[in-house]
Regions:
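Short N-terminal signal/transit or membrane-insertion segments
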Residues: 36-39, 99-104, 273
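Helix-loop-helix junctions and helix-breaking kinks within/between transmembrane helices
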Residues: 23-34, 128-131, 283-287
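Membrane-interface helix/helix-cap signal primarily in integral membrane proteins
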Residues: 2-4, 66-239
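N-terminal leader/targeting segments
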Residues: 1-80, 169, 179
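Hydrophobic alpha-helical transmembrane segments in multi-pass membrane proteins
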Residues: 18, 30-31, 40-59, 170, ...
Length: 287
């Protein structure tokens, strides 16, 4: 456990609650989140006294500064969205096809975009359905901001995309050219490997087995699953298709067991868990 947590006068769970309230104060500012944060601070002073509470405040200030800096960065990114775009690097594992509608995540000039395109032919549809390469698209496109929640407590699409570091939508009107691209970014190759694995499972296994595999192993559920979601929900097995911390913990525990059985030292296994966790996060699409 980090030293600053061990030295905190608060139990870890209570410290986490304070940090969580600071997070919502910055990212979801409202009378409710502000009142909750103030109430927790009052309880902190009442329960632990001034001396102990003052030891916790620097930790809270650090997290408030980090959250505020990130929130300002997001606002700055939204204000700097370009008016036009001509090339997009396609992230292959994000491809979704619904009828003649194609969507995917793309990157251009260091920025991420959520991209939409109406397929012009069955050949185009088949190409993107089977795409297993890193490609760059030359396009004609329009850029817009995602919609915010229209109703109280409604779904905020803009806030959702912010969690993925996406600040703008791109509507492609024409794809002029598709070229293969190379990349030295290891995440590109992890995402490509994820795409190949998803396609292999989709072609090799029937429903609902492939939904189990893609959902539990890779955190991905396609359009076919959405059509069956109501049935799975009524049967009470919808949770079996969701990737959760329990499954991640299971895979990491099994990796530790295997490496320890192979004779590796515990310290070495602890170090290997870090790159494995990063690799697995990429294979789940950072979901």
């Amino acid at each position: 456990m980090p030293q600053w947590i061990r030295n905190s006068p608060l139990p870890a769970i209570q410290l986490a609650l304070l940090i969580l309230s600071a997070y919502f104060l910055v990212y979801r500012p409202s009378i409710l989140t502000g009142a909750l944060f103030i109430l927790l601070l009052i309880r902190l002073f009442q329960q632990y006294g001034k001396k102990s509470a003052l030891k916790v405040l620097p930790i809270l200030m650090v997290f408030l500064a980090l959250f505020s800096g990130h929130a300002l960065k997001m606002k700055w990114e939204e204000e700097r969205i370009p008016s036009s775009i001509s090339q997009l690097s396609l992230r292959p594992d994000s491809i979704r096809i619904n009828g003649d509608q194609l969507s995917f995540q793309g990157r251009s000039n260091g920025r991420n975009y959520q991209v939409f395109y109406k397929l012009k032919s069955q050949e185009e549809q088949a190409y993107f359905q089977n795409l297993q390469d890193l490609v760059i698209l030359t396009v004609e496109a329009e850029i817009s901001l995602p919609e915010e929640a229209r109703n109280f407590n409604g779904f905020d699409y803009r806030a959702y995309l912010r969690t993925k570091e996406i600040y703008a939508l791109v509507k492609v009107t024409e794809i002029q050219e598709i070229k293969a691209r190379s990349s030295w970014n290891p995440m590109d190759w992890i995402f490509l490997g994820r795409r190949k694995a998803l396609l292999h499972i989709a072609r090799s296994f029937p429903s609902p087995m492939r939904h189990y595999m893609t959902g539990l192993l890779f955190g991905d559920l396609d359009k076919d699953f959405e059509e069956m979601e109501g049935i799975y929900s009524s049967l009470g097995i919808i949770h079996l298709f969701a990737l959760s911390g329990m499954q991640v913990g299971f895979f990491i525990d099994k990796l530790r067991y295997l490496l320890l059985r192979l004779g590796l030292k515990r310290e070495t296994v602890d170090r290997l868990q870090i790159p494995f966790s990063i690799l697995y996060a990429g294979l789940t699409g950072l979901s």
